[in-house]
Amino acid sequence: DYERFFAELLTLAQNVIHITMAKHASDGYLNAVEAAKSFENVTVIDSGHLSSSMGLIVLFAAYMAEHHASKREIIENVKTLRDYISSAFIIDSTHMMCRAGRVSKRVQVLCDALLLHPVIHLRKSRMTVGGLEMGDFSHMARSYVRRVFRDARHIDRRILFITYAGMDEERLKYIQQLVRQYCPFERVYLQKASSAIASNCGPGAFGLLFMKKNEAVISFSQASKPDM
């Protein structure tokens, strides 16, 4: 019950900024917007993302709040940041996508026969197929990681989430090895995918989720540093 949730939060804070999953992938955004109409000081923002990529936006918003940014500053920067989150998953098998009606049975059979693996992107709050990789797991994982990190100059290397569904330890270690090879990060977190990702992408899917360098993050980070 969002109204009760917001009411409880407002006993602890003067304003609430609630960041939701992509509005076209979940009912959470619309339900939160409806509940927020009962309050003057609750703002609901569509993150445009799912799973750990939404978490990156929340982490930045929390960082701004802890460093005494205004409500307006947080809202504006969060909306800007949405376009600088890299959020894509590669699918090991299209069976779950077929079951969910996202691809036809014919496409699923073709992908199985040719070892094709769709890459799902989050764009404008929607999940769309943004490309294909080919081959067994080791080949498709290497190709996907190399493609994601092909323009490493524009990647914020502080935090990377390797978000996965139904994957064994050996495969996770292999992905981490590829990350270290192509684009090492200061901190790497292994994170099980949200139900929205897992139910659409199926077991064996994984994504590399991170921020791209952008003026909103750089400017605020510099401004919040204490004077020497």
Q: What would you call each of these model-derived segments?
A:
Residues 1-9:
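Glycine-rich oxoanion-binding loops at beta->alpha junctions
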Residues 15, 25-43, 49-228:
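Mixed-charge interfacial surface used for oligomerization/domain docking
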Residues 18:
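Glycine/small-residue-rich loop that forms an oxyanion/phosphate-binding "nest" at active or ligand-binding sites
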Residues 21-22:
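Short, well-ordered beta-to-alpha junction loops that form the rim of enzyme active sites
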